[in-house]
Amino acid sequence: MKKTFKLILVLMLSLTLVFGLTAPIQAASDTAVSNVVNYSTDVIYQIVTDRFVDGNTSNNPTGDLYDPTHTSLKKYFGGDWQGIINKINDGYLTGMGVTAIWISQPVENIYAVLPDSTFGGSTSYHGYWARDFKRTNPYFGSFTDFQNLINTAHAHNIKVIIDFAPNHTSPASETDPTYAENGRLYDNGTLLGGYTNDTNGYFHHYGGTDFSSYEDGIYRNLFDLADLNQQNSTIDSYLKSAIKVWLDMGIDGIRLDAVKHMPFGWQKNFMDSILSYRPVFTFGEWFLGTNEIDVNNTYFANESGMSLLDFRFSQKVRQVFRDNTDTMYGLDSMIQSTASDYNFINDMVTFIDNHDMDRFYNGGSTRPVEQALAFTLTSRGVPAIYYGTEQYMTGNGDPYNRAMMTSFNTSTTAYNVIKKLAPLRKSNPAIAYGTTQQRWINNDVYIYERKFGNNVALVAINRNLSTSYNITGLYTALPAGTYTDVLGGLLNGNSISVASDGSVTPFTLSAGEVAVWQYVSSSNSPLIGHVGPTMTKAGQTITIDGRGFGTTSGQVLFGSTAGTIVSWDDTEVKVKVPSVTPGKYNISLKTSSGATSNTYNNINILTGNQICVRFVVNNASTVYGENVYLTGNVAELGNWDTSKAIGPMFNQVVYQYPTWYYDVSVPAGTTIQFKFIKKNGNTITWEGGSNHTYTVPSSSTGTVIVNWQQ
């Protein structure tokens, strides 16, 4: 009897190691559709609503707005929310492993057709030419249709993210009020104003940006789009109330358009208003070109309270897998540098193409698409897949990259790569939360390991479509055993054998091959993988996700101060933020048995509700290399720490040198003290005289203007 039991045990252990799992893993609460502040366990599918499926022909536009032949690429094609509902219900999206959809901005857009000789007219099919942020685009559907989309998605464990573009309304001309709809803005049907004769100052009127500076891109128009003045109290309150309309509908996330082109301070206070009302995961669009690194981009990701689309990731993946203009060393360097630069790397939204870029597939072999998808789905961050990528759609540039969805074939290799790898984000926390370590590399081969506690995923990619490589000297954190390819050989992967010292038996990685091997284990010690939101206030609730927390409540420490536990289970803890000195905190967790977790760093606890105030200083003359910054006695102004001072301030568009200005998020209803400083490298020159004082308004926006004190 004992021998029989031992034999069964050995067989069970052998099967366990072959499949790479120690035990069946049940769905964890951190992966639930209700967890709207954590998308690390999700796969997003980006949909240009008008170009996906026409599910209700009765709401299609008429006349010159609409092209039923789907050839005039800047006209409406008829895609709508009912079409998305249909593809959820028929299993196309769920079958692919999609757990979140990002849809076009749902608000009412202009009805004008702009002249366009190439495409026979240009319309607002894309959703970015808003006229009323509190009404729906009728060509996408009604509020009832939108609610049906939300309900259907949630019933299928899919989160819904909306695009939202508070930077602008629609095309307008300063000199021709008849052009398009003159950028007019409506509040639930009531006209607020248009771009010409803008006596209330709802818009910026500084001309179009030439993208020459960060400041220029913020306060001047993007192309011919009427640029909203968020510092105007009416616009500020309007945009904050508008997003609440959609939050009340039950959306689960927000993608903010053109965050590079709006004031950082206003966006931070806008984000605070969202987090105070109904926190949801929010990420912004800040375009970066190939090999571009922008300190303002990094600062925004770390300090704004929202995440960003990871253009550094996207551009490098395209260089390596699509264009062959860089090697795997460049890919690995990007993974390392972004992990160093971005505080919340697992919140960065990764992608290989989108509606503003050439589609990834450009003909020829489809294997580069499949390799890039596999890399994105197994890398850190939140993967977003552009509609049609799984069908190998092509198209260089707008609008060719926004054609009508061509097929819903569930047999393509790309579809099945996604289908097999997407579920790993929920079943293996190494994929959702793990660190990344390069294990073997040459110009064409990248073998990397994701690890979270005892959970491991090892991924091997050979981008060379004609050359195989012998892999020797490979080590891994996978326990001893034989591991099958999670992809089941879909991209020619095979099994590997791991010895007790972590060495992998040498093997051949064939041309174009991709393989994924994994090990999933329950955790007996606490490990934090995600905290959200990353910007909060005393009394608000944040969510801590990870493994090994146990089922009995312990403690969550903000530095050394414990918060009040709201709920506690083995993978997710909700805790109220304690009343502590505002600033950045490292969070740790202590289980009921006394085990202490890792720390999760840089959670920003604000002084209070935020208001955007424009700080202006006159007569601040500088020498070459000097810039003016702002500091003060609250955490939002750096608490007099010059290394945390706000700036460099601007001096070209709204005001001109020697006047400097900056829009800053500061605590509402608070009397603050502040001063300006000049920085030139490590040299700091303080403003003279007494501290300036200012009482921040309790709501709306503010402006304070002072003279530089000698």
Swiss-Prot record:
Compartment(s) of residence: Secreted
Domain CBM20: 605-710
EC number: 2.4.1.19
A Pfam family: Alpha-amylase
GO MF entry, a single one: alpha-amylase activity
UniProt binding sites for Ca(2+) 1: 54, 56, 59-60, 78, 80
Entry's Gene Ontology BP terms: carbohydrate metabolic process
Domain IPT/TIG: 526-603
Chief site of localization: secreted
Record key words, sorted: Calcium, Glycosyltransferase, Metal-binding, Secreted, Signal, Transferase
SMART domains referenced in this protein's UniProt entry, alphabetically: Aamy, Aamy_C, CBM_2
Position of the signal peptide: 1-27
EC category: transferase
One term under GO cellular component: extracellular region
Protein task: Degrades starch to alpha-, beta-, and gamma-cyclodextrins, as well as linear sugars.
Protein source organism: Thermoanaerobacterium thermosulfurigenes
Transferase listed as a keyword: yes
Name by which UniProt lists this protein: Cyclomaltodextrin glucanotransferase
InterPro entries documented for this protein: A-amylase/branching_C, A-amylase_C, Alpha_amylase, Carb-bd-like_fold, CBM20, Glyco_hydro_13_cat_dom, Glyco_hydro_b, Glycoside_hydrolase_SF
